[in-house]
Amino acid sequence: MSQLDVLIVDDEESIRNLIAANLKDEGFNPKVAANSTQALKILSEKPVSAVILDIWLQGSEIDGLGILEIIKKRYPLMPVIIISGHGTIETAVNAIKMGAYDYIEKPFNNDKLVILLKRACEVTKLKRENIDLKSKVIDKTELVGGCSVTLKYKMEIEKAASSSSRIMIHGKVGSGKELAARLIHKQSKRVNNPFIIFSPTCMTTEKINQELFGESEKQENNTKRPTILEFANNGTLYIDEVSNIPIPIQVKLLKFLKDQTITKPCGKNIKVDIKIITGTSKNIQDEVNNGKFLEDLYYRLNVSSLKVPSLYERKEDIPLLVKYFVKQLSKFSGLKERNFADETIAALQSYEWPGNIRQLRNVVEWTLIMNPLTTGNNEIIKPYMIPSEILANSANLTKLEDSFDMLSMPLREAREVFERQYLSAQMSRFNNNISKTSSFVGMERSALHRKLKLLSLHIPPTNRINEEEYEEANA
């Protein structure tokens, strides 16, 4: 089985070490924590596959149930098995209601814990696969949006599709690298042939080797079935997060790229014809410099490069994206279609979206689920209905000076404070595009320029739309 990270949280060192030793023997990679501070620090650095959590933690700021609550908020799919030597039926019921996978009393049988842990990980894996499948059904191959950044991006995809060269897609997590790969395949001459996705993340070296080349350290696992490279023959293979491939497999992949020939464990050579597209959210050049990625392999995969714009760069597409996600969620998940109020869209446009398109889709889905229709009418989604963290972090738009503070100011000063914050928020919303901001706020471009200068609001050079606007705004 793949080596899965498991966090063990228990204030008794002997129990932590005993569970860790047993799990290591079973092929898991255990991590240990004695209190809430250590546990949450480990999770923030890298989420684990499962957590074994004691309820009563002496010397801990937060008890087990408190940690469970935090885990379920931050990592909803992460399975948590509660252990306790002082538990009651009521405690067990509360833990399950809060989202724990199961509850087991100390002292417990090690075999029982391992079976429970394996089952929890398998159930979670199936849930993730189901979510991924639903996401693929919904997103498929449609790039929604019409802003200048998106139109330019669509043209770059068309050019990439017309080329037979290998392509490396660079983009932040959730920005849509897989969608770009699908679009390239869809617009290429290989459209009627297979499009295969391979994600090495969370796979062991042996598993990757077996999937790509059909080889395994265990002779009985040397499969006769076609490998992923064979399945992709005459089509397109998309390797997601390619930097996660271990060096030994990188060497084999490099050898394969030279002549696109697979040598099966039986000794048979198979020639294939595959367009290879790779995706990465990391700076591969840095990985090369740090000895984590083969330089020769990087150059062979990065023949053509495509950068996926972040949602922050495509804020003007948010109204269209929201409508698209609402329709798709209504169609595939049975959620009722709703309209988002203009002020709600404005709040969404003012958020920075570190999770990009994927995060926006999740926010739209969460909003529809948590705000069911109370009447038969299409109730408008108001700002207070979207997640509070979106409102709290929206750039300035929801942070206008408190009205009580303004009451203590003279009219001229209060008006200046409001205008500065209002225009700063609108400029951020429209990505510092003077033309679109002036159109929305109802001012002439020249008047807006003067007002920005008067309020000492400067357009950052890195975000300006063009040189003319920048020079005019900051003259």
Curated annotation (Swiss-Prot):
SUPFAM superfamilies: CheY-like, Homeodomain-like, P-loop containing nucleoside triphosphate hydrolases. One of its GO terms (molecular function) is sequence-specific DNA binding. It comes from the Bacteria. Keywords: ATP-binding, Nucleotide-binding, Phosphoprotein, Transcription, Transcription regulation, Two-component regulatory system. PROSITE patterns: RESPONSE_REGULATORY (PS50110), SIGMA54_INTERACT_3 (PS00688), SIGMA54_INTERACT_4 (PS50045). It holds the Pfam family Response_reg. Member of the two-component regulatory system RF_0895/RF_0427. One of its GO terms (biological process) is regulation of DNA-templated transcription. ATP binds at residues 171-178, 232-241. Residues 143-369 form the Sigma-54 factor interaction domain. The keyword Mitochondrion does not apply. The keyword DNA repair does not apply. The modification 4-aspartylphosphate is found at D54. Residues 5-121 form the Response regulatory domain. It comes from Rickettsia felis (strain ATCC VR-1525 / URRWXCal2) (Rickettsia azadi). This is Putative response regulator NtrX-like.
